[in-house]
Amino acid sequence: MEKTGIIVCGSQGRMGNTIISVLSDYSDLLFIGGVDSNYAADKTTVSPFKDLAELEINKVSAGKFLTLKEALHLTAAIKKKVVIDFTSKSASLIHAEEAALYNVPIVIGSTGFSENDLKTVEDYGKRIPIVLSGNMSLGINVLMNIVYDASKYLGINYDCEIIEMHHKKKKDAPSGTAKMLAESVAKQRHIELAEKAVYGRCGDAAERKKDEIGIFSVRAGDIIGEHKVIFAGNEEIIEITHKAVSRNNFARGAIKAAVWLSEKNKGFYDMRDVLGLNKYE
């Protein structure tokens, strides 16, 4: 059986390292190599491509520094492959463009994209299959459904606040997952998140306004990820919490997305498509 090749972008980061480690559990997948980039305004610095002797990439890439574009060119003989990208929004946009150039599917787990960024990635989805999700875990994606239903049945008289916690080196805030959870509530309540989201409160004008959704971020230690959604009424409080105890969960989700994507035609998908979860009403 032909194995599906996997290239990991952000291979030296927390998620990249975890994905590479977990890939060894999958006999039908082949880790081709890892690219790790630090994109500056006018310069790209990339770590050496991790090569495998059986692919004879080492004859070409030994001692070199490769971009994803160069890595895709070197592995052109491997027809069935997928890129998994956990870098930054700026690097991911470049990688999506390069994947589209070589007609290779890409899974993107980076966060912090603007609406224009998302539109750019969605346009690449007209050329290649793309999965983009702020969280690859089954639990979080199921939680989004639970939060939607909780908002539906509790009603607008229950105020909603979201608290997210991550390790001290996470660069963006709030997390992509917190935004996804807030969007679940906003969609159910038929409001625009951009108009009703409040990111932290400070000063003497912090009184809650109608339909607000508060989102708060904690950055400390090596917290893998914790999200708490609070629905507070006048006489009771409901708290729904998800705690990640291992990055393996996210890695396996990303790998599942890559396998699923390898059999898809062009299109712009999210993790809910991969998991077969119902879309919101």
Predicted regions and their residues:
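Glycine/charged-rich beta-loop-alpha catalytic/anionic-binding loops adjacent to active sites
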Residues: 80, 124-133, 233-240
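Glycine-rich phosphate-binding loop signature in dinucleotide/nucleotide-binding domains
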Residues: 75-79
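C-terminal substrate-binding/catalytic lobe of Rossmann-fold NAD(P)-dependent oxidoreductases
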Residues: 2-9, 14-74, 156-281
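N-terminal Rossmann-like NAD(P) cofactor-binding module of classical short-chain dehydrogenase/reductase
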Residues: 83-84
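Rossmann-like NAD(P)H-binding beta-loop-alpha module
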Residues: 142-154, 173
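Rossmann-fold NAD(P)-binding glycine/threonine-rich loop
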Residues: 90-102, 109-130, 141, 149
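Short glycine-/small-residue-rich Rossmann-like dinucleotide-binding loops
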Residues: 87-88, 219
